[in-house]
């Protein structure tokens, strides 16, 4: 390829013109790994960085960076990117396994070492870590639980678009992915908690601690949106951060 030459002539080639990308609806070219597989598969072979630090080399997730996109409750209770998405090697292996018929996938995956015996194949942007893989029956995760290798099956099961028993999206009460309530933002204490602070005077998820009247006209006595929601908030220690 002459990618650098094209770019220097002010005619850059879009990566997704060859590498398929579900996020853009780009079909790519047959025989090429999709965009996410190509990127993660390559870097996993050359980057020897552990845990979430590997992700932060490219993604804006560093705790001391300018964006700090991972500012929800999970890092506050000691979790990093790899607890849900796997190590860089595991993340890449799942993508490569989904395209195992491509020669480049076979070449890239053979050198990768993972802590999981067999990483299940997955499609990028469509199959992501399943929340209920750790929060089984919407309960507190068991010690040592991990979201790795429990991918959702369909786009409609993604946290950002998933709906509860009443048709409400999860994010309507819990906030956006990676900034779940109560979120911590270094650029403003409750900058990501505007909605619960406005309606409930608390940074906790909407309706937490049996504050259903934030939305409902009367006290609710059962878990209508999902099981196990009428209970005290578990991780109150994060409120002191």
Predicted regions located by residue number:
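Core catalytic machinery and nucleic-acid-binding channels of phosphodiester-processing enzymes
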Residues: 2-7, 12, 16
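Inter-heme linker and motif-flanking segments adjacent to c-type heme-binding CXXCH motifs
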Residues: 2-4, 21-241
